[in-house]
Amino acid sequence: MDEKRGAFMAEYNLEKQHSKGKLHAIERIDMLLDDETFQEIELVKDRHYDGVIMGSGEISGKKVFLYVQDFTYKGGTLGRYHGRKISYLLDMAMKQKCPVIGVIDSGGARIQEGVKALAKYGDIFFTFVW
């Protein structure tokens, strides 16, 4: 496990999730994808991941895109950047004609960000139905 992934799975975060009978986002990715195939996609280098980890990988040798919400970061709530990342991933997957897996572990919209956070749900929904 690289240093960045280790930081996501700090002992505190693992204990917090495991005490609720849940896996951490990174553990979920590791269980879903073929070994050593996950490639994280970041919109802005060195920007915080904002409670959602996204990327591509393979399942039984077939390419898939996925995003996994991390409840240990602000309850997995969807904010503006979080929603922008998911929309970006959905667009990439559509262009490459690949399936998308979304693992939702969220408390909903990040109310502190107001209507701009709520609007991201509309962007994501629009991408799914367009």
Regions found by a protein language model. Give the residues of each.
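Terminal-region recognition feature
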Residues: 1-130
